[in-house]
Amino acid sequence: MTPELNLKSLGAKTPYIFEYNSQLLEAFPNPNPNLDPLITLECKEFTSLCPITSQPDFGVIFIRYIPKDKMVESKSLKLYLFSYRNHGSFHESCINTILLDLVRLLEPKYLEVYGDFASRGGIAIKPFVNYAIKEYQGFKEKRLLNAK
């Protein structure tokens, strides 16, 4: 445990959990809450299971956010995303749940999640979802119109 930040995962032995668990997510105080950086996080090895066939689905997850008072700790995010490994859920549901879990944890000014999933049967699924506080609704609408 990192005492000054009260983080459990960073610097500790890593037990990998492969069942969905939002409690793995951790945050730390934003050192510059007066700035509005757009932070991009990319997970190139996201895996979940198809809820119908139980076959693995592979994708790249992009998370972009403008923090308010808290920022996500990256190792906890990695462990959280790995926890989807044996979780049966459709791509769209995974993306929505990731957004909701991060919004609950961070209470950001703006947050978006985009999934670029490997094709199945010749069709690629690329869900996008975003969230914004009142003051960032215009930014949210523009991002939605220009979603990747």
UniProtKB/Swiss-Prot annotation:
Identify a single GO molecular function assigned to this protein.
preQ1 synthase activity
Record keywords, A-Z: Cytoplasm, NADP, Oxidoreductase, Queuosine biosynthesis
Binding of substrate, residues: 72-74, 91-92
**Compartments it resides in:** Cytoplasm
Show the active-site residues: 50, 57
GO terms in the biological process aspect are: queuosine biosynthetic process; tRNA modification
Q: What SUPFAM superfamilies does this protein map onto?
A: Tetrahydrobiopterin biosynthesis enzymes-like
Reaction(s) catalysed by this chain's protein: 7-aminomethyl-7-carbaguanine + 2 NADP(+) = 7-cyano-7-deazaguanine + 2 NADPH + 3 H(+)
Q: What is its EC number?
A: 1.7.1.13
Query: Per its UniProt entry, what is the enzyme's top EC class, as one word?
Result: oxidoreductase
What metabolic or biological pathway is this protein involved in?
A: tRNA modification; tRNA-queuosine biosynthesis
Name a Pfam family for this protein: QueF
**Which InterPro entries does this one have?**
GTP-CH-I_C/QueF (IPR043133), NADPH_dep_7-cyano-7-deazaG_red (IPR050084), QueF (IPR029500), QueF_type1 (IPR016856)
Q: Name one GO cellular component term.
A: cytoplasm
Spell out the NCBIfam families in the cross-references: QueF-II (TIGR03139)
State the family it belongs to. Belongs to the GTP cyclohydrolase I family. QueF type 1 subfamily.
Biological role: Catalyzes the NADPH-dependent reduction of 7-cyano-7-deazaguanine (preQ0) to 7-aminomethyl-7-deazaguanine (preQ1).
HAMAP family per the UniProt record, alphabetical: QueF_type1
| Protein name in the entry | NADPH-dependent 7-cyano-7-deazaguanine reductase
The major lineage groups are: Bacteria, Pseudomonadati, Campylobacterota, Epsilonproteobacteria, Campylobacterales
